[in-house]
């Protein structure tokens, strides 16, 4: 991107223990795993955005994070997306908790208010575990069951810049705001 625009997205960042648990979930042989530090749950893919609008969004994210405490989110299943046989991703699908859905709706309203165009696909909470090669065949491991209970504890709402290079995609945090755990829930460790 040029100096006036960048590629951006907003995501929830799991804590380190959750990223380790997600990284340990089974994926198909030959899949390119997402590095643990890069595991995240995208709320809004923005794409190309002017720096000025990106700065405005960054200024509003901490207030949005403070307004939305989140419980731990259980992994419901492991799936291949978009669908077999054309799957490109292996994802951990997470429960669509009401608090998470409300946060996503608040973010969508903020993006509209700031005039920031975002992906209009329905919100499906997930974490991308791995990317599949173009010639991948097969089914999700264990019929999609994670094999053991995994709950994702979210620690931050983060605006990322997405950078493309010869080595692949990397994500650089622009601003990250803490998300409080919902009251009465102790995050699993």
Locations of the language-model features?
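Histidine-dependent nucleotide/RNA phosphoesterase domain, centered on the 2H-phosphoesterase fold
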Residues: 1-189
